[in-house]
Amino acid sequence: MSAAAGTVTTEWPACLPKQAMFPPVSILTPTYNRRRFLPWLMECIRAQTYPRERMEWVVFDDGTDCVRDLLEPVAKEFNLVYIRSETKLNIGEKRNRLHVAARGTILVNMDDDDYYAAERVACAVQTLLAKKVELVGSTRNILYYTDDESIWEVGPYNANHGTFGTMAYTKKYAITHPCDPTVVFAEEISFTNNYKTPLAQLNPEKVMLVICHSENTFSKSKLRDAPSPVMRKTGLKLRSFIRKKEMRDFYSHA
């Protein structure tokens, strides 16, 4: 990735040297049979306030519906690294392979079926640099349920907790702290040494809106339907997060 000047709408700490503002970033996306979601994730990446020239998009695809045909036409636009596996792998192993393939010094997760804020990359990089940590994420998540169009907030759990979709980190950390390759969910537990690794918290509104739909690998309806002190229904509406009507219409009934 070549160096390029650029600006972001996020206010950067004045103490940071300008040459450190835009380290090369790899956006990481493991995907499995999510063809209908990927065009909207592309829109989320296009909307990022971080300089496009300083980002690449690394996709690991082990679905039975190969999405190579969807991604090849935009390979140049997104500085794409596409990895195809004919064998379905556990999510822990997929994360590890994405980490190895990434060329950026900072790795930012964007899962295939969620909505990401335009400040997602910029805020993650800013926090990593300003806090001088190797790992950032959010223990609070905002969830949109497509079945009843309600928005909930879950968390916080603890200061070092974060879900993988919210996390960003240095490549050095990722390579030296692999996920358990045998796990099919909750891979962040092994990645963070059971949440003992220091993690700087991000504002969840600057990260993502978790889309809870019928195809989720883990049914998030369990979070909503089981009484919990960390799960709260909000009065927020989808338009508070997604301003573009066409995109909002898709996610509202995804």
List where the protein language model places each region:
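Acidic donor-binding segment of Leloir-type glycosyltransferases
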Residues: M42-R84
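Cell-envelope/extracellular polymer assembly enzymes that use nucleotide-activated donors
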Residues: P23-S26, E56, S190
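N-proximal low-complexity "stem/linker" segments adjacent to membrane-targeting elements
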Residues: S2-A47
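Short aromatic/hydrophobic "clamp" motif used to bind/position activated sugar donors
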Residues: L107
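Conserved donor NDP-sugar-binding/catalytic core segment of glycosyltransferases
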Residues: E119-I151
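The conserved acidic donor/metal-binding loop of glycosyltransferases
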Residues: D111-Y116
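Acidic donor-binding loop at a coil-to-helix junction in glycosyltransferase catalytic cores
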Residues: V183-F191
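Glycine-rich, basic loop-to-helix element that forms the pyrophosphate-binding segment
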Residues: S85-A102
